[in-house]
Amino acid sequence: MKIEKPIFVVFEGIDGSGKSTLCKSLTEKLTERGIPSVNFTEPTNFETGKYLRKFLRGEIDLERKEQIDAFLNDREESLRQNILPSLESGKNVLLDRYMYSTAAYQSGDDLLPETIIEKNLKKNFKIPDLLFYLDLNPAIALERLSQRKENKERFETLAQLEKIRSAYNRILPKETIRIDGVKGPDEIVQECLEIFLRNFNRKFL
């Protein structure tokens, strides 16, 4: 089933909040209902994103301005090659992380999260139609992360996650849909599915 106007949905949250699982699961739920949907993540799998992942893994160091520039460059590729073509083809786009992550994660005493958001908006990056934020206590998120087998990324410490959560609370738009990240993944995806369908008046429930 092709919907009249495809929707751009973004998922935000600190590491360990469950947003990546939610993004994939909701895409599957929509697809099962015959609603054309695709999901992507930032950083991307393009060269711009691979460069950023090296930084996130601690393999290279970047000054804060270099970090911001790298994320902006990757976001341009994300929009040009993934997001906009998919929307134009009639598919909903569900995105794991967007400009709000950059503002929350790359901000510091010398660069406010609000300033980073402004830099993104000046680029005329597309604003999401729906923005979900999975809110979770950093201590719980860190416990979840410790159970994973992957190597830690540079932001996966309690102090960093607390700073990031605080920054999110400063910059997320008032229309952001906040989801309790403590809930189970099945309950969360059902809640978000109902919100998606209700917001756009699609009678697939």
From Swiss-Prot:
UniProt KW Iron-sulfur keyword: no
SUPFAM superfamilies: P-loop containing nucleoside triphosphate hydrolases
Keywords: ATP-binding, Kinase, Nucleotide biosynthesis, Nucleotide-binding, Transferase
Enzyme's top EC category: transferase
Superkingdom classification of source: Bacteria
EC number per UniProt: 2.7.4.9
InterPro entries reported for this sequence: P-loop_NTPase, Thymidylate_kin-like_dom, Thymidylate_kin_CS, Thymidylate_kinase
Enzymatic reactions: dTMP + ATP = dTDP + ADP
GO-annotated biological processes: dTDP biosynthetic process; dTTP biosynthetic process; dUDP biosynthetic process
Keyword Transferase: yes
Gene Ontology MF terms in the entry: ATP binding; dTMP kinase activity
GO cellular component: cytosol
Chain sites annotated for binding ATP: G13, I14, D15, G16, S17, G18, K19, S20
Function as written in the Swiss-Prot or TrEMBL entry: Phosphorylation of dTMP to form dTDP in both de novo and salvage pathways of dTTP synthesis.
Family: Belongs to the thymidylate kinase family.
PANTHER family: THYMIDYLATE KINASE, UMP-CMP KINASE 2, MITOCHONDRIAL
Protein name: Thymidylate kinase
Organism: Leptospira borgpetersenii serovar Hardjo-bovis (strain L550)
